[in-house]
Structure formats: C-alpha cells, structure tokens
C-alpha cells in the first residue's frame, strides 16, 4: 500500500490539474470512480482541495481546448458531466481556491461558478481573486519563475501563505509545513 491516511488527504492542482483535483472532490463517492480505482470510496475521499486557477466549466467561459483534450471523441456526450460546477454535492470537501482577474487563458468565471456551487451546497470555501497575474504561475515569485522571469506576479505571491493558514485552521492534523521563500 501507499500508507496514505484516508482521513488526511488534501488534493491540489493548477489549471487542468485543478480540474483533475476538483474532479476527485466531486466524484470521489461515485460507483464509477470506485470501479476505475478498485478502491472503496472512503479510501480516496479528499478532506480538502486547494484549487489554483482551475479549469471548471465547459460552458461559455470554459477552456474548450482542455475539455476537448480530456474528452476526445466523447466531448459532446460528456462535456456537461465534466463541468464540475454542476457536480458539487453536500459531500464535496471544503475548498481553498484562487484565481487572477487578468487570467485570459482560464477565465475567472470558472472559479466564480465553482465557488457559487460550493456556497449553494453549504460547503466551506476560502476564495481569493488577485487583481494582476497571468495564467500559469506557481508560487508567483523567483522560486518558480522560469529563466526569463515569467511566473513572477507579486500581487499573487500571498496565495501560498494564505493556503498554509487555511490548512492549519481547517485541518488541525496538518503539520504546518511552510514553503521557504
């Protein structure tokens, strides 16, 4: 086994990876996922999600290329099912989510739709929208910037500290590991 403590799972993802993490959050208790993984649903249930400018919707504001890559020939058949704002239930885990106002690749509407769906189901969510910042940034500082400086977005830099505080507050078992700057 992987020695994973089933009650201590936090999933995270950026952009299309955010869609993957959020998919686990909304589909963890489905028979379909249990069949795919061969595991009991409770063993794969995330306790929380950290979603970083995630692809969420195949709707008007969706990132169609991501959905076409994900669904291939079954795009028309599955695009609504994989629009995660429609899949949130009372069993979806609490969520930390952030985005940037300037993101022109995955539009802000994606997180707005997901946060609204979480709110309507009574799922606790911490949501941050930073005024500046391109798509595809990591820690938004020199640690994750590429060699020509792309990836530095000072307005977004607080996201990792905010996420750490959220983890410590929401999950008492969290070890409080800090990312060195």
What are these regions (language model features)?
Residues 9, 95, 125:
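Hydrophobic anchor at the start of a short beta-strand
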Residues 104-113:
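Conserved alpha/beta-hydrolase "acid-adjacent" motif
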Residues 84-92:
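Conserved serine/cysteine hydrolase catalytic core
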Residues 91, 96-99, 103:
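Short beta-strand/loop motif that positions the catalytic acidic residue
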């Amino acid at each position: 086994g992987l020695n994973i403590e089933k009650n201590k799972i936090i999933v995270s993802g950026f952009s299309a990876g955010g869609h993957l993490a959020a998919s686990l959050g909304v589909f963890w208790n489905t028979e379909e996922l249990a069949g795919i993984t061969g595991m009991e649903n409770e063993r794969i249930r995330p306790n929380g999600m950290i979603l970083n400018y995630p692809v969420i919707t195949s709707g008007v504001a969706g990132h169609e290329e991501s959905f076409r890559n994900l669904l291939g020939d079954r795009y028309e058949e599955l695009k609504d099912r994989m629009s995660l704002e429609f899949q949130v239930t009372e069993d979806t885990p609490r969520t930390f989510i952030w985005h940037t106002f300037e993101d022109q690749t995955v539009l802000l509407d994606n997180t707005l739709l997901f946060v609204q769906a979480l709110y309507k189901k009574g799922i606790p969510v911490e949501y941050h929208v930073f005024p500046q910042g391109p798509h595809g940034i990591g820690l938004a500082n020199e640690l994750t910037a590429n060699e020509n400086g792309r990836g530095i977005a000072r307005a977004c830099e607080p996201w990792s500290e905010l996420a750490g505080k959220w983890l410590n507050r929401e999950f008492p078992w969290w070890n409080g590991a800090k990312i060195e700057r």
